[in-house]
């Protein structure tokens, strides 16, 4: 069991996750975005490459409407000449706007997310997880609810070491009620594979359940970008609905 499989296999239900790091071969940044879902509305989605980004779109409009559409449909990744923005919500657009500021990833995230709170999905209050790759560097962010209801914002530099990444997810992993939200610093993980396809497939396999009737996987996307030319992209997407 490699470090990718080992970490992700322990997460029975991670919700959505972002992993960022450096490819195991070549000077390319890697961004992984994955969706898992328990409810029918969360499952009724897919990732689609369009309009200079990767968008979360419904596979069944009627089923999706049974959930909170505002939280279920959004741009997961947006590409710009200066870099890449990624998140689990509509805050992705604000992050992309900040990529052209000339600032590094942490200042870009801090400014873009200053007005964003955790998701209004009581009693869980799902965190907003975000990241960006800009100016040859990467960063991650976690916006979550504190014990007294306050908004806690954390920002992290992501070290770019060959074959290694950092991961944040919306939930800690146990599938129980209420879902325990992610806390602390991003988890260290190996980035398996030398291409976006190999990395996406490794993540998709690692998220497979022990019991087939509890397969929460929805989609996985992997993007690699040149460190010197962030608009030089390679993309691979896996949608579970297209594999069954």
Language-model-detected regions and their locations in the chain:
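Conserved short alpha-helical segments that host acidic/polar catalytic motifs at enzyme active sites
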Residues: 1-244
């Amino acid at each position: 069991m490699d470090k990718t499989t080992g970490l992700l296999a322990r997460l029975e239900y991670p919700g959505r996750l972002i992993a960022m790091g450096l490819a195991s071969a070549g000077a390319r940044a890697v961004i992984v975005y994955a969706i898992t879902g328990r409810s029918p509305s969360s499952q009724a989605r897919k990732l689609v490459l369009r309009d200079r980004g990767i968008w979360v779109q419904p596979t069944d409009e009627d089923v999706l409407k049974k959930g909170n559409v505002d939280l279920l449909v959004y741009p997961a990744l947006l590409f710009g000449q200066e870099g890449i923005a990624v998140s689990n919500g509509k805050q992705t657009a604000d992050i992309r706007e900040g990529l052209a500021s000339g600032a590094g990833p942490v200042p870009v995230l801090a400014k873009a997310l200053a007005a964003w709170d955790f998701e209004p999905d009581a009693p869980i209050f799902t965190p907003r997880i975000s990241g960006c790759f800009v100016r040859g560097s990467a960063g991650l962010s976690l916006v979550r609810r504190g014990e007294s209801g306050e908004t806690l914002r954390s920002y992290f530099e992501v070290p770019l070491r060959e074959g290694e990444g950092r991961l944040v997810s919306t939930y800690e992993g146990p599938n129980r009620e209420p879902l325990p939200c992610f806390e602390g610093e991003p988890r260290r993980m190996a980035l398996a594979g030398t291409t976006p396809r190999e990395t996406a497939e490794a993540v998709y396999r690692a998220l497979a359940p022990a019991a087939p009737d509890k397969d929460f996987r929805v989609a996985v996307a992997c993007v690699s970008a040149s460190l010197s030319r962030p608009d030089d992209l390679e993309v691979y997407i896996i949608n579970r609905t297209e594999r069954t």
